[in-house]
Amino acid sequence: MTDYPIKYRLIKKEKHTGARLGEIITPHGTFPTPMFMPVGTQATVKTQSPEELKAMGSGIILSNTYHLWLRPGDELIAKAGGLHKFMNWDQPILTDSGGFQVYSLADSRNITEEGVTFKNHLNGSKMFLSPEKAISIQNNLGSDIMMSFDECPQFYQPYDYVKKSIERTSRWAERGLKAHRRPHDQGLFGIVQGAGFEDLRRQSAADLVSMDFPGYSVGGLAVGESHEEMNAVLDFTTPLLPENKPRYLMGVGAPDSLIDGVIRGIDMFDCVLPTRIARNGTCMTSEGRLVVKNAKFAEDFTPLDHDCDCYTCQNYTRAYIRHLLKADETFGIRLTSYHNLYFLVNLMKKVRQAIMDDNLLEFREDFLERYGYNTSNRNF
């Protein structure tokens, strides 16, 4: 049996759904699942210190291979002793492969069997990223969990295109496995693609499972499809993945999508959503979305969320936070970002308890009753 650096331990299955309570063991510690992972694109979660992230219960964070390759460079980070030392974070780190960022540069990229040529968004220079290069960068970064280089096809692309794409992604995954220099202390995940086509998802999953990765990601979702379409893809994709390995749904952070992903057997999630909307003064609360910059909060001396015990809600009022944001004070963004991240990390803590109590469906109903059933129409 292969001795993986990343191990999944199942603690309990929920009786009424596909949800599972567990933990993932990594070279930099163990974290409970299901877990939401804050995104630290440039080796920092925007405006948050490592100490603040630990205080809110973030057991793992994500960093971005593409951005760190371009700046400051993966070789510089390797000289610093790896990403953990560079950013002073002693807990697990997951890095993506750069594939999604290249996907988002659709107007300036060219995909071949060898890899992807694209324009550097910082200076316009021509760049080339291959499966081997994506693995080499992540080996230099030293993350605990790495991602295979993949193409993320658009959800509504034609069947023939998506079929060719997933077959190439499988070949890229095999090349990445061969290029992996540190399988003893970095776990490489395969990424299942296939857009909304069940047979292609099945083909992609079968290819990757045969390669025996330490964990598996479900990619190509949260890219414009409806909430119902995402759930349908998870319904037929998650059961294809091994029960004894972690399952990661990439790029998902809306509260209803997190709960629905857990119900379908997902263990890990990430998204820039909580910090991105926080910078515009949009806050997640137990009673739904709150835009604290609105004029009606100018004299509101209550917390962002009466049911939240985070640092922001324990110490500051809506009126004060609104003032900071209107005055372009960074501290305001720090407070809203901390609150939103805490909200999702704490939501997952409640979800884990609901799995333990076998009442996840009741928890979902109660949560959405207060939060609002139309969350999927809010981009939130």
Swiss-Prot record:
| Catalytic activity entry | 7-aminomethyl-7-carbaguanine + guanosine(34) in tRNA = 7-aminomethyl-7-carbaguanosine(34) in tRNA + guanine
Q: Kindly list the positions annotated as binding substrate.
A: 96-100, 150, 193, 220
Respond yes or no to whether keyword Disulfide bond is given for this record.
no
Q: Which GO terms describe its cellular component?
A: cytosol
Subunit composition and interactions: Homodimer. Within each dimer, one monomer is responsible for RNA recognition and catalysis, while the other monomer binds to the replacement base PreQ1.
Its annotated function is as follows: Catalyzes the base-exchange of a guanine (G) residue with the queuine precursor 7-aminomethyl-7-deazaguanine (PreQ1) at position 34 (anticodon wobble position) in tRNAs with GU(N) anticodons (tRNA-Asp, -Asn, -His and -Tyr). Catalysis occurs through a double-displacement mechanism. The nucleophile active site attacks the C1' of nucleotide 34 to detach the guanine base from the RNA, forming a covalent enzyme-RNA intermediate. The proton acceptor active site deprotonates the incoming PreQ1, allowing a nucleophilic attack on the C1' of the ribose to form the product.
Its recorded name reads: Queuine tRNA-ribosyltransferase
